[in-house]
C-alpha cells in the first residue's frame, strides 16, 4: 500500500509518509488522509478520499457509520443522575464525595497509566490540597494498540463526561482541560456536540441537583469550566505531563 500510493496518486502536492500508531490498530491497514481516517485501506479508497480532501471536502464516509449514544438516550437510561446526586453533596445521608472515594478504595480500582496508582487514594490526595484545583484529561493514546479510548468515546461520550464531572465534583476542580489526540478529528466533533448538548440540558433544567426535601425545587447544576484542546503530536505535550 505504501509503495503503490505515490504512483497511484501521482501528485506533487500529496506526500505519502509512514507514521507510527494513529490509534486505529483494529482497522489495519489504516491511513490518515488529512483529517480523514481510512479503515482497512485499499489504494483505490485512499485515492478517493485524498481527492476529496484536495477538493475541499468537509466530511467523508471513510469508515462505517458509528452509533453514538446521544443525550436523550443517555438521560433515559439514568445518565447524569450520579453527577446530580454528588453535586447535591449527600448520598443516603452520607457525604457523597467521601462515600465515592471509600467505594473506589474498597474496589481497589487502579489507574491505567503504567504505575497502577490506586484511584481512590489519588482522589483523596487531590481533594485534600488547597484550591484552586484543575483537572487534565489525557486522551492521546500514543502507544500501538491503545485505541480503547477512541472506541469508547465514539459510542458513549456522555458516560465519559459524567465520569469526568463526578471526579471533578468530588475533588473540587474549578476547571477541566480535555487533551484529545490531534488525529481524532471525528471524535473531537462528537465531544464538541456532546458538550454543547450537556450545557444546553443544564441550562434548560433537564439536569439539575435534587433538593434534600421533596417540597423544595431542584437547584441548577453548576458545571466547571471545560476546555477541549487539540493534541500536539505526543501525549507528553499535555499540561499534566509537562508539569511532571
Regions found by a protein language model. Name each.
Residues 1-244:
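Feature of Fe-S/electron-transfer and energy-metabolism proteins
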Amino acid at each position: 500500500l505504501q509503495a503503490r500510493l505515490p504512483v497511484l496518486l501521482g501528485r506533487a502536492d500529496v506526500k505519502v509518509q509512514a507514521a507510527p500508531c494513529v490509534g486505529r490498530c483494529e482497522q489495519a491497514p489504516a491511513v490518515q488522509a488529512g483529517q480523514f481516517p481510512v479503515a482497512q485501506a485499499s489504494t483505490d479508497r485512499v485515492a478517493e478520499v485524498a481527492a476529496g480532501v484536495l477538493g475541499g471536502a468537509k466530511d467523508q464516509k471513510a469508515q462505517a457509520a458509528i452509533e453514538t449514544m446521544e443525550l436523550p438516550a443517555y438521560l433515559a437510561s439514568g445518565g447524569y443522575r450520579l453527577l446530580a446526586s454528588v453535586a447535591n453533596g449527600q448520598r443516603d445521608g452520607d457525604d457523597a464525595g467521601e462515600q465515592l472515594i471509600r467505594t473506589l478504595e474498597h474496589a481497589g480500582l487502579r489507574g491505567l497509566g503504567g504505575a497502577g496508582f490506586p484511584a481512590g487514594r489519588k482522589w483523596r490526595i487531590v481533594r485534600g490540597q488547597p484550591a484552586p484545583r484543575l483537572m487534565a484529561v489525557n486522551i492521546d493514546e500514543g502507544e500501538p494498540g491503545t485505541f480503547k479510548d477512541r472506541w469508547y468515546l465514539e459510542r458513549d461520550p456522555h458516560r465519559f463526561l459524567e465520569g469526568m464531572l463526578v471526579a471533578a465534583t468530588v475533588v473540587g476542580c474549578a476547571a477541566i482541560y480535555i487533551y484529545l489526540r490531534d488525529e481524532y478529528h471525528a471524535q473531537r466533533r462528537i465531544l464538541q456536540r456532546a458538550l454543547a448538548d450537556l450545557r444546553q440540558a443544564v441550562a434548560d433544567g433537564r439536569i439539575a441537583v435534587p433538593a434534600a426535601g421533596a417540597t423544595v425545587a431542584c437547584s441548577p447544576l453548576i458545571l466547571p469550566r471545560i476546555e477541549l484542546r487539540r493534541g500536539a503530536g505526543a501525549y507528553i505535550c499535555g499540561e499534566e505531563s509537562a508539569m511532571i
